[in-house]
C-alpha cells in the first residue's frame, strides 16, 4: 500500500524577541500542507505531502492525524492560525475548506484558540505589505512552510 503522507521536519534558528506562548500556523493544502510551531526558543516547520484522496472523510481524518503527528507533546494552550481562502483562486476550494474545517476542529478539541485569516491580512500583519508573499521573504524554505511560518507569526504579534 502506498503511504498516505510524508512529513519532513525543519528546525530553523529562532527569531530575536520570540513571542511568549505557543503559536501554530497552518498553510492548508490538498496535496501539500505546511505547519509551523513557534514555542519559546524553537521554530519547527513541517512540510507535508499528502496522497490525493477522492473521499472527503478520509481527507479530513488524514488532516487531523497529520496535525496530531506533528503537534503531540505540547501541553500548553495555543493559538492556531489557519490560512484562509485566497479569493483569486478557483481550484479545489471545497477540498481546502474541508481541510481548514478539519484542522480547526482538531485545534478546538485541544481547547486551542483558532483564527482563520485571509492571506492578505497575514501578509499585512507580518510584512506590512499585502502583496509580499512569505516564500519571497524566506527563499530558503519550502513555500508551504514559509506560508505556515507567516501564519504563526501573524497571531503571535
Predicted regions and their residues:
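Phosphate- and other anionic-substrate recognition elements at nucleic-acid/protein interfaces
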Residues: 1-157
Amino acid at each position: 500500500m502506498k503511504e498516505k503522507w510524508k512529513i519532513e521536519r525543519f528546525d530553523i534558528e529562532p527569531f530575536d524577541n520570540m513571542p511568549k506562548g505557543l503559536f501554530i500556523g497552518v498553510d492548508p493544502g490538498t496535496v501539500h500542507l505546511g505547519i509551523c510551531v513557534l514555542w519559546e526558543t524553537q521554530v519547527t516547520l513541517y512540510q507535508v505531502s499528502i496522497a490525493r484522496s477522492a473521499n472527503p472523510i478520509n481527507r479530513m481524518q488524514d488532516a487531523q492525524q497529520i496535525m496530531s503527528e506533528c503537534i503531540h507533546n505540547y501541553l500548553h494552550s495555543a493559538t492556531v492560525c489557519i490560512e484562509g481562502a485566497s479569493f483569486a483562486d478557483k481550484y479545489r476550494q471545497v477540498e481546502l475548506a474541508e481541510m481548514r474545517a478539519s484542522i480547526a476542529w482538531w485545534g478546538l478539541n485541544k481547547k486551542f484558540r483558532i483564527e482563520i485569516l485571509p492571506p492578505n491580512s497575514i501578509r499585512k500583519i507580518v510584512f506590512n505589505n499585502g502583496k509580499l508573499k512569505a516564500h519571497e521573504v524566506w527563499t530558503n524554505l519550502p513555500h508551504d512552510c514559509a506560508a505556515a511560518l507567516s501564519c504563526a507569526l501573524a497571531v503571535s504579534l
